[in-house]
């Protein structure tokens, strides 16, 4: 999919750059694979805002995606590639030989009519899912599991991928987009190829309203508030906040590390925070 530029017929069109979706299916999703979605507006069951900057947006239906790919040794045919409002990647409707339909994340270079299969060991071509331990070293893959049978958790957004860089002690070593290198169990599943829609990051929405259609509300900067409302608030004239960036509740933000799972630290070979080699 390429990028689409628009003529500046209005201020909102000037600079507007969107992904060209002309090659996607234009009909409705499969009803049996969708569910209604109720908007929360960022509120919890008590009506309190628990996640700021959420509200409004176009009505959406949730599409059930097969992240597990545990339907082994049954070949499927890609019926169509669709847009999914719930994620940045495109999705593919697969019809298996036994008649079952399923949505999967569409990888790059997957086209309508292509055959895909999930097996313990399969051909290394986009859309095929297999155990990480059976993939050749150097393979680019996505939708990678962290626990066998749990379903893919790593590399699911547009353009994301993981590269298998080695094997050791019955496990595989993968390199993530962030630069982190870590061990994963060899019996975890992964799907060959990088996720579709890599140009998603190059879009320019052109106007605030287009972001509002996505259900994202504007966020007021802390330095623009009063001291009663934010730790960065107040001061005479424009100020920088006077301290390291914090949330309205005084917790460090913008780069503060929040990882707490020490049990799995031993599986991380190279941290994503390690200095990049020149």
Swiss-Prot record:
Name of protein: Large ribosomal subunit protein uL2
Gene3D superfamilies assigned: 2.30.30.30, Nucleic acid-binding proteins, Ribosomal protein L2, domain 3
Cellular component annotations (GO), alphabetically ordered: large ribosomal subunit
Tree of life domain: Bacteria
Natural source organism: Erythrobacter litoralis (strain HTCC2594)
Cited HAMAP family: Ribosomal_uL2_B (MF_01320_B)
Listed SUPFAM superfamilies: Nucleic acid-binding proteins, Translation proteins SH3-like domain
PANTHER family for this protein: LARGE RIBOSOMAL SUBUNIT PROTEIN UL2M, RIBOSOMAL PROTEIN L2
Pfam families, A to Z: Ribosomal_L2, Ribosomal_L2_C
Family recorded in the similarity comment: Belongs to the universal ribosomal protein uL2 family.
Compositionally biased tracts (Basic residues): 269-278
């Amino acid at each position: 999919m390429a990028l689409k530029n628009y003529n500046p017929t209005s201020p909102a069109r000037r600079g507007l750059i969107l992904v060209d979706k002309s090659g996607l299916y234009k009909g409705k999703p499969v009803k049996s694979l969708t569910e209604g979605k109720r908007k929360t507006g960022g509120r919890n069951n008590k009506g309190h805002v628990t996640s700021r900057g959420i509200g409004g947006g176009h009505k959406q239906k949730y599409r059930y995606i097969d992240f597990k790919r545990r339907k082994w040794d049954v070949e499927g045919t890609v019926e169509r590639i669709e847009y999914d409002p719930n994620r940045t990647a495109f999705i593919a409707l697969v019809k298996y030989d036994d008649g079952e339909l399923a949505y999967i994340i569409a990888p790059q270079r997957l086209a309508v009519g292509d055959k895909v299969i999930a097996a313990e060991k399969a051909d290394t071509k986009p859309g095929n899912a297999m155990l990480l331990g059976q993939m050749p070293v150097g393979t680019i893959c996505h939708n990678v599991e962290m626990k066998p049978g749990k379903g893919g958790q790593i590399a699911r957004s547009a353009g994301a991928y993981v590269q298998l860089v080695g094997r050791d002690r019955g496990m595989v070593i993968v390199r993530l987009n962030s630069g982190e290198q870590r061990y994963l169990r060899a019996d975890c599943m992964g799907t060959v190829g990088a996720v579709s829609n890599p140009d998603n990051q190059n879009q320019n929405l052109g106007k605030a309203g287009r972001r509002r259609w996505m259900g994202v509300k504007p966020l007021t900067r802390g330095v623009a508030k009063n001291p009663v409302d934010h730790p960065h608030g107040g001061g005479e004239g424009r100020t920088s906040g006077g301290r390291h960036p914090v949330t309205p509740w005084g917790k460090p933000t913008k780069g503060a590390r929040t990882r707490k799972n020490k049990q799995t630290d031993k599986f991380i070979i190279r941290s994503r925070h390690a200095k990049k080699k020149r």
